[in-house]
């Protein structure tokens, strides 16, 4: 039986550094095997439910391609394609799907939803994103770091810039604490993560040799950084009345060439989970600018399109890292 067989993947809080390294090593192997035409199928005849209450490009494609590569059959259940939370409770949905499928992926709203699915389905459940966490993204991020940096994760100085209350920032902080990293947040104080989560991560970091630092001073936070990471400043499902104030508040935290230079590290890298606002080629960016007369770019196009950027390496690794999570928890390996 596999090392993590039948485990849920809900939060990196549930895993040890050894568990995370196992998934990262497996992701590397699966990527190499696919490229060399040597990939073995560990998920043959498995049926997988993909519940998407929130739309996605990278997460959906990664799960579907990974399932196909591994010989599994994936069924996509979109926000209009089920009775979840409308005519049927999460608990009842879990009990139904658990009798039809070998595993369930959920991308949607509250963390409690994915926890209820895990409790009542009796099959492995994978968190594709909730409002609170995005753990599959972090495995892809760490996989990319291991590929691109000639040093272990616990020697990497990683800075998250911008709105640090979101699911990506939360999951990164948890993952960094687990792996003993120097993790810093550069954000307005009003956009720091919850004090409860920060305390938990600091306690973990104390045991792993890591360090968690929060600062509203950009120069202080980014000095010596190996990685500058950001995410969008506004989300399309939010109350638009808060956008104008937030866009103004986050201007000093935009990743641009000036911030790159402030790191004093010529080998610094930029990362982003995507999608990104870096130019006016999307309707959403134009709409925000037209309505608020504020540029919504969390990163400049100059940085995004530069050699500093690892955004698309990171995006590619969503596939291989998600495949590793699936194989580790469900596969006959």
From Swiss-Prot:
The keyword Transferase applies. Pathway: Amino-acid biosynthesis; L-arginine biosynthesis; L-arginine from L-ornithine and carbamoyl phosphate: step 1/3. L-ornithine binds at residues 167, 231, 235-236. One of its GO terms (molecular function) is amino acid binding. It is found in: Cytoplasm. Keywords: Amino-acid biosynthesis, Arginine biosynthesis, Cytoplasm, Transferase. The keyword Oxidoreductase does not apply. InterPro entries: Asp/Orn_carbamoyltranf_P-bd, Asp/Orn_carbamoylTrfase, Asp/Orn_carbamoylTrfase_sf, Asp_carbamoyltransf_Asp/Orn-bd, Orn/put_carbamltrans, OTCase_ArgI. PANTHER family: ORNITHINE CARBAMOYLTRANSFERASE, ORNITHINE CARBAMOYLTRANSFERASE, MITOCHONDRIAL. Belongs to the aspartate/ornithine carbamoyltransferase superfamily. OTCase family. NCBIfam families: orni_carb_tr, PRK00779.1, PRK04284.1. This is Ornithine carbamoyltransferase. It comes from Clostridium acetobutylicum (strain ATCC 824 / DSM 792 / JCM 1419 / IAM 19013 / LMG 5710 / NBRC 13948 / NRRL B-527 / VKM B-1787 / 2291 / W).
């Amino acid at each position: 039986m596999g090392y993590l067989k039948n485990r849920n993947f809900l939060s990196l809080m549930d895993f040890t550094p050894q568990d995370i390294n196992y998934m990262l090593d497996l992701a590397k192997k699966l990527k190499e095997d696919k490229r060399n035409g040597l990939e073995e199928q560990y998920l043959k005849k498995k049926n997988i439910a993909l519940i998407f209450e929130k739309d996605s490009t990278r997460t959906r494609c990664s799960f579907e391609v990974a399932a196909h590569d591994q010989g599994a059959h994936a069924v996509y259940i979109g926000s209009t394609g089920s009775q979840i939370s409308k005519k049927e409770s999460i608990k009842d949905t879990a009990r139904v799907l658990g009798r039809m499928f070998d595993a369930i992926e959920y991308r949607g709203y509250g963390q409690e939803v994915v926890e209820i699915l895990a409790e009542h389905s009796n099959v492995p459940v994978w968190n594709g994103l909730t409002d609170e966490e995005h753990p599959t993204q972090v495995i892809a991020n760490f996989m990319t770091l291991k590929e691109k940096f000639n040093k272990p994760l616990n020697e990497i100085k990683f800075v998250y810039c911008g709105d640090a209350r979101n699911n990506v920032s939360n999951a990164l902080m948890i993952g960094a604490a687990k792996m003993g990293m120097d993790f810093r947040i550069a954000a307005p104080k009003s956009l720091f993560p919850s004090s409860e989560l920060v305390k938990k991560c600091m306690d973990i970091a104390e045991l792993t040799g890591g360090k968690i630092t929060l600062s509203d001073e950009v120069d202080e936070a980014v000095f010596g950084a190996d990685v500058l990471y950001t995410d969008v400043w506004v989300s399309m499902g939010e109350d638009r009345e808060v956008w104008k104030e937030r866009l103004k508040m986050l201007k000093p935290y935009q990743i641009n060439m000036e911030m790159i230079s402030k790191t004093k590290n010529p080998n610094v890298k930029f990362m982003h989970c995507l999608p990104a606002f870096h130019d006016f080629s999307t309707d959403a960016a134009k709409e925000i600018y037209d309505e608020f007369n504020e540029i919504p770019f969390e990163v400049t196009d100059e940085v995004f399109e530069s050699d500093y950027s690892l955004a698309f390496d990171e995006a590619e690794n969503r596939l291989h890292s998600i495949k590793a999570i699936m194989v580790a928890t469900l596969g006959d390996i």
